Amino acid sequence: FMVNGPKIWTSYAHHANHIFCLVRTDNSGKPQQGITFLLIDMATPGVSVTPIVTLAGDHEVNQVFFDNVRVPAVNIVGKENDGWTVAKTLLTFERSSAYAARLMTRLSELQPLVATSDEPALIMRFHDLEVRAKAIEVTEFRIQASLAAGQSPGAASSQMKILATEITQALDEISMEALGHHGVPWQLAAREPGSNAKAIGEPAAPKLVADYFNNRAATIYGGSNEVQRNILAKAELGL
């Protein structure tokens, strides 16, 4: 295969030694047909990576360019022209098992900050989200058990993606409210590994502010929540 074109919003491409791509290999048929799932060595001539700095000031995502990149046919995952099926399967499993640990970490980070709040309504909102996050954790365990039994997560993966990312954003909003004016300063130096710079106000402020900005995209990446609701409408309601 000869691959040309860009791939954007690629997480940690600047650290990766391989990348997967959905490439157009046949223009006949429906748009989702004629797509092939390829693994590409990042050291292949013609591959270049351009960084994208996020709203939080981080370099996590990138745009990768492919200029006459030669990829052997042995690097196909699945079958030629059936890459969309492979990608959907990959995303289904990702959406069904990627959120509980992150939510539990976020709760543990926020709990000390919320505990110092004198706003009863904010504390109640936090505990409501805590219960919902733990429900996500239990549901994820249930899905993992079904996967171990050889079953598919099905539409449950879309439900998980919607609920978990919206809980994440709600927790981020609580963190900003709890930080108050300490949530405003842009403290990149305090977040640098090995830096001796101290945070203004709450020690957790630099990370929580960065998380708030980065997670604005949580309901978009991995398949937007609007698309997930359409999947549920079709799979569960027959609409």
Region spans (language model):
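Buried hydrophobic positions in well-ordered alpha/beta secondary-structure cores of metabolic enzymes
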Residues: 3-5, 38, 66, 126, ...
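A short core secondary-structure module
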Residues: 4-50
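Glycine-rich phosphate/pyrophosphate-binding beta-alpha loops
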Residues: 8-13, 55-56, 217-224
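A generic structural signal for well-ordered coil/turn residues at beta-strand boundaries
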Residues: 15-17, 34, 43, 59-65, ...
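Short, well-ordered loop/turn and helix-capping segments at boundaries between secondary-structure elements
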Residues: 24-28, 41, 45, 71-72, ...
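Glycine-rich beta->alpha junctions and the first turn(s) of the following alpha-helix
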Residues: 47-138, 218, 234
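Glycine-rich phosphate/cofactor-binding loops in nucleotide/flavin-utilizing enzymes
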Residues: 85-98, 182-239
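C-terminal helix-coil-helix/basic helical segment that borders enzyme active sites and/or dimer interfaces
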Residues: 120-123, 134-196
